[in-house]
Structure formats: C-alpha cells, structure tokens
Amino acid sequence: MSSDAEMAVFGEAAPYLRKSEKERIEAQNRPFDAKNSVFVVDAKESYVKSTVQSREAGKVTVKTEAGTTVTVKEDQIFSMNPPKYDKIEDMAMMTHLHEPAVLYNLKERYAAWMIYTYSGLFCVTVNPYKWLPVYNPEVVTAYRGKKRQEAPPHIFSISDNAYQFMLTDRENQSILITGESGAGKTVNTKRVIQYFATIAITGEKKKEESTPGKMQGTLEDQIISANPLLEAFGNAKTVRNDNSSRFGKFIRIHFGATGKLASADIETYLLEKSRVTFQLKAERSYHIFYQIMSNKKPELIEMLLITTNPYDFAFVSQGEITVPSIDDQEELIATDSAVDILGFSPDEKAAIYKLTGAVMHYGNMKFKQKQREEQAEPDGTEVADKAAYLQSLNSADLLKALCYPRVKVGNEYVTKGQTVQQVYNSVGALAKSIYEKMFLWMVTRINQQLDTKQPRQYFIGVLDIAGFEIFDFNSLEQLCINFTNEKLQQFFNHHMFVLEQEEYKKEGIEWEFIDFGMDLAACIELIEKPMGIFSILEEECMFPKATDTSFKNKLYEQHLGKSNNFQKPKPAKGKAEAHFSLVHYAGTVDYNIAGWLDKNKDPLNETVVGLYQKSGMKTLALLFAGGQSAEAESGGGKKGGKKKGSSFQTVSALFRENLNKLMTNLRSTHPHFVRCLIPNETKTPGAMEHELVLHQLRCNGVLEGIRICRKGFPSRILYADFKQRYKVLNASAIPEGQFIDSKKASEKLLGSIDIDHTQYKFGHTKVFFKAGLLGTLEEMRDEKLAQLITRTQAVCRGYLMRVEFKKMMERRESIFCIQYNVRAFMNVKHWPWMKLYFKIKPLLKSAETEKEMANMKEEFEKTKEELAKSEAKRKELEEKMVALMQEKNDLQLQVQSEADGLADAEERCDQLIKTKIQLEAKIKEVTERAEDEEEINAELTAKKRKLEDECSELKKDIDDLELTLAKVEKEKHATENKVKNLTEEMAGLDETIAKLTKEKKALQEAHQQTLDDLQAEEDKVNTLTKAKTKLEQQVDDLEGSLEQEKKLRMDLERAKRKLEGDLKLAQESTMDVENDKQQLDEKLKKKEFEMSNLQSKIEDEQALAMQLQKKIKELQARIEELEEEIEAERASRAKAEKQRSDLSRELEEISERLEEAGGATSAQIEMNKKREAEFQKMRRDLEEATLQHEATAATLRKKHADSVAELGEQIDNLQRVKQKLEKEKSELKMEIDDLASNMETVSKAKGNLEKTCRTLEDQLSEVKTKEEEQQRLINELSAQKARLHTESGEFSRQLDEKEALVSQLSRGKQAFTQQIEELKRQLEEESKAKNALAHALQSARHDCDLLREQYEEEQEAKAELQRSMSKANSEVAQWRTKYETDAIQRTEELEEAKKKLAQRLQEAEEHVEAVNSKCSSLEKTKQRLQSEVEDLMIDVERSNAACAALDKKQRNFDKVLAEWKQKYEETQAELEASQKEARALSTELFKVKNAYEESLDHLETLKRENKNLQQEISDLTEQIAEGGKHIHELEKVKKQIDQEKSELQAALEEAEGSLEHEEGKILRIQLELNQVKSEIDRKIAEKDEEIDQLKRNHLRVVESMQSTLDAEIRSRNDALRIKKKMEGDLNEMEIQLNHANRQAAEAIRNLRNTQGILKDTQLHLDDAIRGQDDLKEQLAMVERRANLMQAETEELRALLEQTERSRKVAEQELLDASERVQLLHTQNTSLINTKKKLETDISQIQGEMEDIVQEARNAEEKAKKAITDAAMMAEELKKEQDTSAHLERMKKNLEQTVKDLQHRLDEAEQLALKGGKKQIQKLEARVRELENEVENEQKRNVEAVKGLRKHERRVKELTYQTEEDRKNVLRLQDLVDKLQTKVKAYKRQAEEAEEQSNVNLAKFRKIQHELEEAEERADIAESQVNKLRVKSREVHTKVITEE
C-alpha cells in the first residue's frame, strides 16, 4: 500500500480513498482471536459481530457486540477476518470470503466514506448521498497511468485501466455501470466522461481547434456539455432518486491510434415519454420544465408565454414541483450554456425552448362536449393560440385537426368526429411524440457536432441505462427497463461465469465446471422468445379488435402455470391493480397492462402530423418530415415510435432490435463492470441497511464474481505476447540463435522465475494466471527494467566521459602548441626583417585575392538564383504534398465511413432477411387462414341465400307483430298506471313462456349460434324427443333433459324474485355473456359445417332463430340504454343529494352568521342581493330537475313496457314456429337418428346457454328493480321538496326573531354610543392629567425614596406637629407669598402651553380626518367613516346599520333560500368574493377594535392610578385627621361617598344586567374579530410595538407624576386649608372613577376582554370602600387638630385651589396634546406607509406602462417595417415596370401609394390594395395591346405580369399585416391611455398624501417643540413646588415643636 507521502498527490481526497499508515499499523497490532471472533445470523441486522463462548454438539453459544447471548447452529456462524483485512480494498484478497465479511467490509468503508471497493474483477460503489472531494482535478492527474494495484479503488482507476488496455491490447473497451434506480449510475458515468475528456488531451500542446461557425467549444468541452443537456431533457425525480435517468445511453468515445481524443457519439434507449403527461405524487416531470419556470432567464418566460408557477400547467404539476437537492436556476444556466457549447444555432435553440413550452400549453387545452352530441369542441382557444404560436401553426387548423381529424377510408379521406376523451388522448399522444422526437433530434445534432471527422481507431463505450425499477404501478416502460437490466445481468453472468469457464476447457486447463446458479435465461425467454410476452403483445397489435383483456387472456393461457417466472399477482389493498407478475433477478414485479396495445402501436393524429410537417418552424417540420420518426436519423438505437410503412414496426419490436444491437456491441468489446449499490431507502448519508445491500449483492453476483476470481484464472496472455513482454526477466532461459516455440519458451521462462508455480496454468494458446500473479510479474519486470536501464545508463555515461576526456586532452595539446607559437612570435615581432616580411607578404597575394573575390561573387549570384529556384520548387512540392495528404485523409475517412456503412448495411440486410422470413411465415399463416375464411364464407353465403327466402315469409309475421306492438305502445301511453301492474302481466307472460319452453329447447339443439334464444330451441328438441317414444334410449335422454329444464325453470323463477337488487352481479354476468358469446360464435362456425347435412327445415329454423337473435340483441341494446339512463339518473340523484346536503350545511352556516349579525357589513348585503337572484334561479332549476326526473321515469316505464311487448312478440313468433314444427313432426322422425348423434355436442353447450337465459331474465328483473327505484327516487325528491318548504318556514320564523333582536340591539346601541362618548371625554381628560403629571415625575423621581422616609418620620411625629403648628404661622405666610408668585408664573406658562396644545390638537384632528378620507376611498362602503375615524364606535354603528339592513332583507329569506339551492355552485364563487370583502371590512373593524383596546389600556392605567391616588388620599386623610377640627365636614364627605357608592353599585348592577343581555352578541362579534385578527396581526405588529412602547413610556411618566403629586400633597398636609381642597379632589376623583367604571363596563360589552375589565372595576370599587373606611378611622384625630389650623388652611386653600385649577387645565391640555401627537404620529406613519405603497404601485404601473409603450413602439416599428417592405415591393415593381415603357403610369401610382402608406398607416391598406388592383387591370389591358403590337416584348410582358402578381400578393400580405399592426397600436394606445390615467390618479393621490404628510410633520415638529418648552416650564414650577414643600415641612416641624 501507498504511504501517506505517496497519497499526498491525491490532495484532500486521500482520506476518502485509502486508510492512513497509522490506521493500518493499529489494525495490524490489534489483538484478535481467530477462533472465537465470528459473525452470527441475526433476524434484524442479518449478521452481527460476536464472540464464541462455548461449543457443544453442533450448537455454538456466542455473545454479540450488544451484549446479548444466543445459541445458534454451527452453520449459522462465519469466521471473521483478521483486523489487517478491515476496510480491505479488494475483497477477493480476504481470507474468509462469505456474505457477512463482504457486507461488513463495505459497511466499514462506507462509514469512512470510502465508497469504491474492488470485488475481484469489477468495482463496487455505494451511493454516499453527499458530495465528496474525490473527483477533483488533482485526483484525475493522480490516477493517470497508474496500475490497478498502485492506486486506491476508484471509477477513475477503472477508466484508466480501460484506456490503457485499449492502447496496449488494441481492442475496443466498454464500461458497464449498472445498478438499481438511485444507486449513482449517472454520476459515475459523468465522472468517466470527465476523466477521458481530461487525460486524452493532457500533455498536448494545444487543444482541438473548432471549426469556425460550427462549434463554440472544444471537443472535450462538448463531450462534457452533452451530459447536462441530456440530463435536463431526460432526467427526472422519482421515488428513489432525485436525478433519475429516464432513458438509457451508450456513449462511445473514439480515440486515435495514439490515444488522442478523436470524436464521440451517443446512442439512447427507452426515453420514458409517458412522464411528459403523467407523474406519480412523489415524482415530477423532466427537469427542463422546472428550469424554464425558475425565472432565471425571464426572457424565456416571455417568449414561451408561460408563468413561473408550475401549478398553472397540468402536465408538469401532478407530482412534486421542487427538489431540495437540485437548484433549477443554476441548472438552467448549465443547460443553456451546454446548448451554446454544442453548436446549436439560435433558431434551433429557440425551437427547443418553444417546443418545450408548447408541450406545457398542450396540457392546459380544454375541450367540452357539444350539447346533445358526443362530439368534442374547444372550451376556449387562448391556450391553443399560445401553443400554435409557439409551433408556427394556425390555431384554428390545430383545433379542427384535433376535434375533426381526417382518416383514410379506402381511397378517400373522411372527417371523423372525436369524443372529449379521444381528443385528450390525442393531445397527450402528440405532446409525448413532440418531446420524444425533439429529444432524439437533439441527440442526432449532438452526434453530428461531436463527429470531428478525425481519424479514429478504437473506442471506449460507457453504458448508463435506467436501473431496475419496482414501483406501485408498473407499465410497459418498466417492463422494457427491467428486461434490459435482465439482459445486462445475463451478459455479466455469462461473461464472468460461463465464458470464463468455457475458455478454461477450450484451452485444455484442468477445471471442474462450477454452476453458480446465475442463469437468467428462463425469464429472458419468457419475455422475448416466440410466444413470449413481447411476441403476444405484437400479435395482438396486429388485430384491430384486440383489447387489453384479450391480451391478458392470451398471456394466462400461454404462460400461467407453465412458467415459474410468470405468476398471477395477489390483490393488495391500497396498491394499483396488477394483471401479471414476473420473477426477475432483482425481485418479483407486478405489471399492469392497461393501455399496452396503444402504447405499443403508438398512434398519432395524422391530420395534426400533417400540420406539423407544414409548420413554419423548420425544426418541427424536420421532426415529422416524410412520416419518419426522428430516431431514424439519430444514428443510434433509440426507442422511437412506430415506423410507417408495410412493416408496421411496433415500439416493442424496435426496442428489441435496438437492445440486440447494443448487446452485439457489448460482446465485441472487453467489458469492465461497475456495480452501484443503494445503501438505504431514505437517502440518508452514512446509513446502511444490511438486508437491502445483501439483496443487491446476491442479485448482482458479487460474491460469485469474487469466488471465480479467486478460484479461476482471471488474467491470461498469449504465449507470443508473454514471451515478448517478460523475456527480460530471464533472458538466459531462452537460447539465442535457435528457433524455439513460444509456448515452450514461456514454460522455460516461468520455470526459471522465482514464483509460486501453482498460480498459473498453460493452455493451448495462452498462459493463465490467478488473481494477483500477473501484477507480481509486472512488478518484477519493472524492477528488472530498472536494473537494466541503470546498467545501460552507467555504460553510456562512462563512454561519454571517456570521449569528453579525450577531447580535453586534445584541447590541452592544442593550447600548448598555440602558447609555444605565440611566444616565438613575440620574440621575432620587433625584428626588422620580420617587419619587412609583414609588409611585403600581403602585396604578393592581393592580386590573387581580387580574382578569387570576383569568382566568388559570380558563384554567389549563381548560387542565389539556384537557391530561389529550389525554394520555389520546394514550396510547390510542399503544397502538393499537403494536398495529397489531405486527399489521403479524405480517402481514409471515406473508406472508413464506407466500411461502417457496409457493416451497417450488412446488419440491416441480415435483419431484413430475418424480417422477410418472419413475414413470409406470417403471410403463409394469413393465407391459410384466409382460405379457411373463404370456405366458411362460401358456406355462409349459401346458408344466407336460404335464410333470405325464409325471411320473406317471416317478415309478414313481423309486420303483424309490429302492429300489435304499436297497439300496445298506444295503450301504454294512454295508461301509465299499468306500470304498477307489470308484476301481474309478467306472471302471465311467465305462464306463456312455460308453455313455449319445450319449443325453445328444440330450437336450442338445432342452433347453437343463437346465444340468448337457445333455451327455446332446446325446448323444441325436447318436445320432438317426447313425440318419439318408440326410441326408448333417446326418449330417456330427452326426458332427463326435460326434467332438468323444468327444475332449471323453477330455479330461474325463484332466482328472478331474489335477484332484483343485484345490479352489479348482473353487469358482471353481462360481461361473461359477451365473452361466452365470442367463444360460442367460434364454436357455432364449426358446428355450422357439421350441421350442413341437416335438411332444409332445420335451416328454416335457423332463419327464425336469426330473427329472434336480432330481436334479443335489440332488447339487450334497450336494456343497456335503460341501464345507462338509470345510472345517469342515479348520478343526478347523487348530485342533487350532494347539493341538498351542501345547501343544508350552507343554510346552517348562514343561520349562524345571521345570529352573529352584529358583524355583518354592507358587502354582505350586496352578496345577499346576488344570492336572492341565484336562489330564485336555483328554485326554478330544482323544479325543472323534478319535472325531468318525472319525465325520465315515464320514459323508463315506457321502455320497460316496450321490452315486455317485444318479449310478447317473440312468444307469438315462437307459437307460430311451434305450429309449423308440429306439422313437420312426422317428417322430422326420420331425422332423429342424425339429431341424436349431435345431442352430446348440444348438451355441452347447454350450460352456457342456460347461463345466457338466466342473464336475460336477470336483466328483465333489473329493469323492474330500476323502475321501482326510480319511483322511490321520485317519492324521495317529493319528500325533500316538502322538507325544504318546511325548512323555509322555519327560517322565516328565525328571521322574524332576528329582526326583533336587531331592533333591540339598535336601541341598546344608541345608549352605548352616548356612554362611549362620555367615556371618551373622560379618558381624554385623564390622559391629559397623566401626561402633565409625567413631566413632574421626571424631576421628582430622585426624591421619591427620601419622601417616603420623611413620610414615615412624619407619621411618628404627628403629636409633635400639633405643638409646632402655632410657631409655623409666620413661615406659612412667607411660603404663601412665594407660592402665589410661583403659581402665577406657572399659570401663565400653562396658559401659553394650553394655546399651543389647542393649536396642535386642531392640526392633529385635521390630519386624522385626511387620513380617514384616504382610508375610506378604498371601498365604497367606508364612505361613512370619512369624518368619524376618531370616534371609537364608528364601525359598531356601521355594523348595526348593516344588521338593520339585513333585518329588512331577512323577511324575504324564504324566496332566497329556494333560489340558493339551485345556484349553489355559482353561489360559492360569489360567497368567496363576498368573504374577501367582508374580511377587508372586518380589517377596518379590527382597527377600531385596536383603538378600543388602547382606550381600555388607558382605562386600566387610570384605574391603577386611581388606586394609587386612593391609597395616597387615605394617607392624606390620616395626616389631615391630626387637625381633628373638621370631623363634621368629613362626615358629610362620608355620606356623599356612601351615596356615590350606592349609585356606583346600582350602576354596576345595571351594567351587569346589560352586560348579560349583550354578552351573546359580543361573543359572536369576538369570533369574527378573532378570525380577522389572525390575518391582521402580522400586518400591524410594528405598529403594536410602537404603541406598546408609547404606552410603557406613558405609564412610567404617569407613575412618576403620581409620585410627584403624592409628594406635593404630603408637603401641603401641614396646612389646614389643604384639607378642604383635598376633600374636593377626593370627590372629583370619586365622580370620575364612577364615570370611568360605568364607561368601562359599557366598553367591555363591545370587546373581547369585557369581563376582565369588569372585575378590575369591582376591585377598584372595593379599594375605594376600603379607603373610605380608613377615612372614618382618621376622622376623630382630624377633628381634634382641625380647629387649630382652620384659619391658616382657609387662606392656603384659596390660593391652592386657584393654582390647582390652573395646573389641572394645563395638564389636561398637555395630555390632550400628547395624545393628539401620538395619534398624529401613528396616522402619519400609516400615511407614509400608504405613500410608499402608492409609490410602489406607481413604479410598477410606470414599469407596465413603459412595457406597453415599448410594445406600442415595437408595433410602430413593425408598421414602419411593413411600410418599408411595401416601399421595397414598390421599388421591385418599378424595376419590373421599367421593362416596358408603357408601364410608367402604373409605377407612379404605386410610388404614390407607398408614400401614402408611409404618412398614414390607417389608409395604407385601402390605398395599396385599390392602387394595386387598378394597376393590375391597367397592366393586363396594356399587355393585351402590346401582344398585338410587339411580339418581341411579349415574353417580357408575361414575366412582368407574373412579377406583378407576386408583388400584389406581397402587398396584400403587407397591408393585412399593417392593418393588424394598426389595430394592435390602437389597442395598445387605449391601454396606455387608461394606464396613464390611473398613473395620474395615483400620482395625485401620492402628492396629496405627501403634502398632507409634510404638513402633519411640520405641525408635529412644532407641537413637539412647544411641548418641550411646556415641559421645561413645568420643571421650573415643580422645582418651586419642591422648595415650598421643604418650607412646609419646616413650618410643620416648628408647629409641632411649639405644641
């Protein structure tokens, strides 16, 4: 194994591919008990790890990992492998090979996310259900060129091995990726393609250059991009897989001789086109539909005229519409880019999207049935217009072709009417065909793009086909998919087990054949062999009258009980019906054969196909061109539809042909298998279900593959190749210089190598190796080569160094020589003679040098010329060479293509020969059958002639019967009451039938072909046999049959009375009779030939029997009609019952709503008006339905009487036949011998005929039963009618009661309104006081604790206060002076604040009114709220008004009730609309309710404040009681309080009574409010938070103000004058409290939390009473001390009263202003939100307007373009006119016409058309003149006329187009005007809202500023009050001290 350093090349994928070194070392060192460590069988986990505890007598006791101890048999335990084999990469290397070892190895590797594992010769992969980093580019690079044993298991390793085998073995390879659906086949296929596309170009200097204008990406990019495109159109979500391939594909990647990527092609199989129109609930259609609707490319939505909601399209919304693991938006981008990379033109790309959109629109096309016809007609044309537009078709032609297709009858075409269901089936078939042909065409285009014409030598095929599928509903598609997997599994088994072992025997290796039990031939033969499932299916498709039932019967007859793989499924509850089961290798699958014949024949509407062929969309016309399916062009085996022509090739036949071609391709390659496994059914990463994985391992033959890999010799190599490759291991073993056989050489070579010699065997042509040995030899070879190369490198390096050393020595010697010469030269350089030599030497050679230079120049010029010539020749030769090479390549490609074509032609020839043989055999069969039919036909013709003679005689009798029947019908019409007497008449008829039974038996024996009348025939035969008493044996037989018939008759009579209600059994028996009829028809044909020897009298009886049979058939037809009518009546009755129950429930709901009339609105009044009209219409419809039911009952009675009359007619015929037969009795005696021989045959058919007779009688009884049931239905309807009248009266009474209740409520409402107004006023006053006190609280909060301590000290010092009171007089006077000054200043400030607050209040009120007017404009019914938004009871008044209106309408409710019952369905729609309006109005009511809740919150706050005030008042009274002088005044206060208490108690009692009276009404209102509240809560959450925050702030302010007020009161308690003021305050507080309580009780009645508030009020009253009791206790103390402080208190009280009044006024104004500010802020916020909403609407409308304007501009541009085109036409016309000088006038007219078109579009059509016509007339007249004058110009004039006509047509087209554009422009202009008007209105509203908002904001800021100033002034006043309070305490202290 590789070390961690070596695994580093895999990057972050290393831990997901192989165990680390640390883990391997730990596994090797882990203790292991080989004897006791075992796997044991477990019921839940299949196998669990255990430890052996003991072994006894074949039993083993083990302890599992879970700690449980079990005892099992010896054969139920399996030894565990040592720890070093944990997570082993190749399971073939394990010591103990068995199921648990394989299972746990896979499980442990899966837990470590090692999803790939070798299993002998193939690879097993487990779906991880998550992304793992094992496919990164560095992983691809790491696997390139690695041997299998050198790298961890991976799909890249399999791919690289296949690539290397292709290069070394020169053999085509294939990779078969198989497994069940959802196992990960598609992902692994993509990785294989990714690997080949990467390695095949890695290392190249440049990539393949794309052909200009054809490709937009390189070849490898296109190969990779083909996958997302095919996945988008061919993959879908299934139950088991979110990205399941719904088609199979075989991708061949072609390589050149050097391994370079050359080209690729794709073959597809079995596209599941039914998914286009139908999906199961947990599945969805193909990804492309949802990608388009993801809105990632909005231009597609606009182009395809679709929406982004899949539920708007029926074809794609039957299951799920989203997949969590798939991002449809990103996938759309990938798909779109793949289309571009693959070189699709823009038109082709648009066509793909348009056809996909057209398929979606097909699913929305609606059709309905014409009245009184079964013919279908379109139900709206909007969808059809869209679909036709996308397909460039005419919408009317498309609808006409769908509803009235033309079919060929003989040599003529006739128009055929279609039913609604037939039209829907046709639309679905067309949608599926378009999608399938488009998909196959895309594959063809992809193949064309991937075919680069480069030389290719080998290919690697990758097979990815749909996995084995077992659904709840399995159809023909599942059978084809499962059959394909069966064939692939058989191929795997055959390759792994059979071929492997056969090759051993062929090579002469000693081998004992092992049967692994993996043969799947039985199932395959059951499906594909002659008389198999496909064969029977194709045979049934040849017969026009074949049905699914006949197909099922043939399957049962041929295979049920004869083949173990064919079973009859057991019916399962909750699952779809199954007709047969097949035992596949992966499990038993139940198949439903519904619709198989149509799917196999794949019929299409030929008329619509003809439209497709003429479509303006080239792609669509190409798909349906020439009646050939697109798959014929795709070049690959594809599923496709049927092929037109004589062969009538079905879907199953084409599928088998393609499958056989695929198997042939696979057999010609060297396969590599990859087995994909599903770990669990829940798609949970890391979880593995043992039983599921074991099942797949067993089915896939994984264990058997490992065993044969271990036992067999999976590696083999030819002797010559082995000798050539491995000779290097021991070259001395093979002698040099002499010939030696390759086999002997291989034997010597292997014998001389140090290996295990039992691991290989020698065959005749190959040497075979066990697994792993060849890898060992490769390693030895690599080591040997490394040694040899090392030695070679050493020798080479030594040689090179010796050469280099020699050169170095030579250079050394040269250097020495040069140095010697230089030294010598330096010595003689200055010698005079040497100088002279230097001067003379050049002169001696200068002349020779000049000559040489001249010669050299000449030679240079010549050489230059020759070089130029040679260069030119070289270039010419190079060009020729390039051309020749190109021709050579072209010829090679041509030869290769011709060879491929020849091979394909040979294959087709073979197939045609096979087909010819099959067809010849079929022709022989058909010919023989035709001859038999001709013989039978001849016989029947002769019989027919005889029967026609007899028919003439019988017609007279029939006429008489018809006259009788007419009389009976007249009597029946006259007396309908005879229906009740039918039982008596039937009894009489039964007696008549009993008399004629014998005659029926005679006819029955004579004619077996008369199914329903054979009973009478047998009776006749029995009568004849009784007459022949001389023949004893025959008489005994006939008497026995007579007795049986009598018993049968008695049984039939009893059964007739018992089976009156068995309608379902009768229907089943009718089906059986029809089946028996078909069988009897065939038998009767044979019997007719046997009866040919009977005399002419029997033939007469046959004629009579034929007439009777016709009558019986007519009766059966009438019975069926009666049954259909009864079923229709039942359906109508059920519908009426349903409507009645729905209306009853609706009435109950309405009655409940009427009881809750308090919440009714004006919208409900309008809804009631509508319902009144609908109710009247419903009453009329009900009466019409009643009349119709009565008429239907009368019709049924009439038809029943007709059937009875016809039976009487048959009886009369039988009587006449009886008379005739009695006359011929003597003649028939001679024929009894012949008849006796036929008795046995007749008796066999007797049972079937008896059953037929019983069926007829049952049908007769059923008719009676149905008639009685119809009468009972009429009675029930009458009872219902009476009951409805009763209910109507009851409702009238209830309405009267409601009216009285409403009037009472109205009176109560007025009282409540007054009370609520009073409450509102009081609340405002208290709110003002709270806000004023809030400011004081802020400044006094820090003194609160101190004041409380001082208060306690003051209570302790009460006695001292009395002594110090006298001393404080002087200080009190001083304090009074300061206090007066402060009070005056504070009064002025408060007056100023009051003015500002009044101004702010007025502005706030104006703002509220503006906002209310905005709100009221939303609905007409809210107009009354414009000036009353501030009033909290506005909505209650409006509801009461609506209630009063409803009371008035209630009086006419009886009429409304009847009308509602007839118009229930329409009423539901209106009800929903009215409910929406009611919810809108309830929203407004809820807003008012929120305001109420706010007021209640304020009320609760006030109550708490009042409680605190009362507590503090009690404290004050305790302090005041120290005065003790005013006890009498306090007693008066007590009396007054008692009086107020009694008044409050009375008010509370009155409130409780009125509360109980109104409680029911409020509860009902609360229910409606609660319903509305849930919808509005989320909208007002933000506002509620703001309001709550403001409430909390106000509460804190109020509390602080209250504490401040308490401190003020305590500071003034020292003065006796404060006492009376405090008493006055107390009285005022009590009065306000009483008013507040009464108002709270009244408000509680209208709100949800009324009772709670009432309890709070009661508690408040109790607190007041307790406060009064406290006051009583303090009276004595107050009286004793009051006299001392009276004088001072009076003076202080006067000043304090004045200040207090000013303070209260200012506080009320301040509080009122704060409340107004808050309301203003809230209204302003809502107004801003409204403004934002309006701005958003305006922006949206502006966007829409811009789009519309843009469309108008486009239309104008089109019009201009049309004008331009018209101008061009005129110019062309002018050119034509120039050919003759006489056409100049026409030219001017046309030019003038074109100019007019340019200036006025409206007049373009008329001017161009009229001008064109006039010019044509003039031109034709002029041409006739010119023909006589100028013969030479005749040809040109004719051409001019032709051109003029052409231009005339184009001008007409342009004028028509111009007119259409003009209309569009006008329509768009109108729409633009309307939208502009709306925009202007919105703008005005927005501007008004903005102005109002700005005004309100300014007012708000101003008021806020004033409020801040008032607060500052209040703070100053409070500080002064605090100073006075301190001084008051000092005075108080002094007074106490003095006392």
Curated annotation (Swiss-Prot):
Residues 1125-1147, 1153-1172 are annotated as: Disordered. SMART domains: MYSc (SM00242). InterPro entries: Kinesin_motor_dom_sf (IPR036961), Myosin_head_motor_dom-like (IPR001609), Myosin_N (IPR004009), Myosin_S1_N (IPR008989), Myosin_tail (IPR002928), P-loop_NTPase (IPR027417), XRCC4-like_C (IPR014751). Residues 843-1939 form a coiled coil. The modification Phosphothreonine is found at T64, T69, T419, T776, T1241, T1255, T1265, T1286, T1467, T1501, T1517, T1730, T1736. Residues 1128-1147 have a biased composition (Basic and acidic residues). Its main location: cytoplasm. ATP binds at G179, E180, S181, G182, A183, G184, K185, T186. The modification Phosphoserine is found at residues 79, 392, 1092, 1096, 1162, 1237, 1243, 1261, 1278, 1288, 1292, 1303, 1306, 1413, 1474, 1495, 1514, 1542, 1554, 1574, 1600, 1603, 1714, 1726, 1739. GO terms for biological process: muscle contraction. The keyword Metal-binding does not apply. The modification Phosphotyrosine is found at Y389, Y424, Y1464, Y1492. This is Myosin-4. The lineage of its organism: Eukaryota, Metazoa, Chordata, Craniata, Vertebrata. The gene is MYH4.
